Amino acid sequence: QCCPTMPECCRI
């Protein structure tokens, strides 16, 4: 899932 405050979380 993508984090609103951390868009890069989507890449992981």
Swiss-Prot record:
Residues in coiled coil: none
An MF annotation (GO) of this entry: toxin activity
Positions of modified residues (Pyrrolidone carboxylic acid): Q1
Primary localisation category: secreted
Compartment annotation: Secreted
Top-level taxonomic group: Eukaryota
Intrachain S-S bonds: C2-C9, C3-C10
GO terms under cellular component: extracellular region
Expressing tissues: Expressed by the venom duct.
Residue numbers carrying Isoleucine amide: I12
Record key words, sorted: Amidation, Disulfide bond, Pyrrolidone carboxylic acid, Secreted, Toxin
Domain notes: The cysteine framework is V (CC-CC).
Family: Belongs to the conotoxin T superfamily.
Listed name of the protein: Conotoxin Vi1361
Gene source species: Conus virgo
